[in-house]
Amino acid sequence: MSSGRGSRIPEYWYGQVPVPPFMRFMEVIYAGAVSLRRLAYRRGWRRRYGVAVPVVVIGNLVAGGTGKTPLTIEIVARLREAGWTPGIASRGYGRRDPKTPRWIQPDTPIELAGDEPAMIAWKTGMRVRVDVDRSAAARALVAEGCDIVVCDDGLQHYRLMRDIEIEVIDGQRRYGNGHLLPAGPLREPMVRGRLCDFRVLNAGQYSDRPTSGFGPSDWQMRLHIDHAQSLQGSRRRSLDAFSGQRVHAVAGIAHPERFFSMLRQRGIGVVPHAFPDHHFYRAEDFTFGSRLPVLMTEKDAVKCRAFADDWFFSVPLRVELPTVFWTALFDRLERLVSC
């Protein structure tokens, strides 16, 4: 049984029950506000800010997680391999004192960093700037010598001018019932995704060609798990070592069941513990009543290192995308810098 502490998503968002009439009314108001805001930026009524280097924005249209951060980390790694010096801009959701801009290091206290920026800094070793104003974060990164800015989330942050937009779509939930907030999960209408340069479908069937049923700039991404890393020391174990065993599986992410399912597919007996997205852990959260290994996502692990023991393991995600996707992305970047 799950601990039942995961964040609650309205059942009508994903079609289990009809949308309440009042929410349909609120959706109309929200839709008008979204359209007016986008028009204000298009017409120049609200100012936009750019920087002198390419800006890549990775985001989604729905509220909640879709796999943006693992893709951000993989893109940053590929950029480094290609000789770029990327910097990462993020809002830093859930951190203390959220209006204060801050540089995030791998050892920045989690309550000051936010879990996703902390994980990005830990995994990439690159400069990470958190700021509610992504354009200010981008300027700070460029001032520190970054020659490309990758924005983790921020598709709706039109204040920051961008060169490449990548929409990430949940391969299972897609756009839910297709309604805008609060009647559905959409932050913007579905047609907004067609304006993005690339659309990445998380957890779709892998293919080395564009995704069937989408468009020529739509690609399928798979997330793989194959080992667990001890939070104390450098001990690494294959997930096969846990096959046939019971473990406490911990996930404080938007869709914890996805993580639990991935572990089950590896033959692991999962005792699930779902926590709210962005939950800040205490040692008391792990009083499970039985001494079993604890497997958790990397996003959770960065918040548990201070009190973890030898039984705590993080499970890294490995991103797989078609070779043609990377070729298309880097071709676009080369054209940008050669202009």
UniProtKB/Swiss-Prot annotation:
- Which Gene Ontology molecular-function terms are recorded? ATP binding; tetraacyldisaccharide 4'-kinase activity
Q: Which InterPro entries match?
A: LpxK (IPR003758), P-loop_NTPase (IPR027417)
What EC number(s) would the UniProt record show? 2.7.1.130
- One annotated Gene Ontology cellular component of this protein: plasma membrane
Q: Which residues bind ATP?
A: V62, A63, G64, G65, T66, G67, K68, T69
Q: Which NCBIfam families match?
A: lpxK (TIGR00682)
Function of the protein: Transfers the gamma-phosphate of ATP to the 4'-position of a tetraacyldisaccharide 1-phosphate intermediate (termed DS-1-P) to form tetraacyldisaccharide 1,4'-bis-phosphate (lipid IVA).
Its family remark reads: Belongs to the LpxK family.
Give the protein's recorded name: Tetraacyldisaccharide 4'-kinase
The protein's organism comes out as: Xylella fastidiosa (strain Temecula1 / ATCC 700964)
Q: What is the lineage of its organism?
A: Bacteria, Pseudomonadati, Pseudomonadota, Gammaproteobacteria, Lysobacterales
